[in-house]
């Protein structure tokens, strides 16, 4: 099975050469993490490991800092293949890096209690389903910060550039609630290149991206309506081109990107503050 995000040079969505100084990027991120931790007087990092490519890359680079790294596996009604990939990745890092330790915190009972307490019928209309799905992400954020504070560790984000700044494919105050974001300036395609350089397990490199927030399998592409390479292309032309400048799938993708990008601004802009006129304060 080919990697789902591989994009060929004949693709209409090709934006530039896929070559990258992967080793230099890895060293740069590791150094950035070390320097930030030192400035923050933190002992290291806590990372939620899902079995996906982003968390695998972040945790593998964090391991190379030499600082304490706590990897949390936090299943909530998780699919067996996601659990096995996460556990395999944690074991591999623990075997190589003495500064890495893993921990499993099964949040399914807590989540089930919450769902029962708020009386959500999970077959009800989509808004309730989405709210409950986002509750999974927020429960994991709470857990990461608990162990982060307990151990003097920075909660380390795993969002990529497309998710964090392109289409807002993250949960506000969920996986978007972090102290630092080491790979948020990298596209998904670039992260796959780094994963190959880091020798991330093939099972993770070949897994179809999913956010893991649903009982049924919902891929990222199905939820967003476009693949990561398509959205990377859209991000590169957004602001200089309009959907009407293109035809067919390119036009459709840029329309999707434009809609998602506009809708996600509340996730990245500062919290609005009601400014009181100066004369009212005298």
What are these regions (language model features)?
Residues 2-45, 60-70, 77-80, 88-135, ...:
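ATP/NTP-dependent adenylation/nucleotidyl-transfer catalytic domains that generate, transfer
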Residues 55:
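Catalytic nucleophile loop
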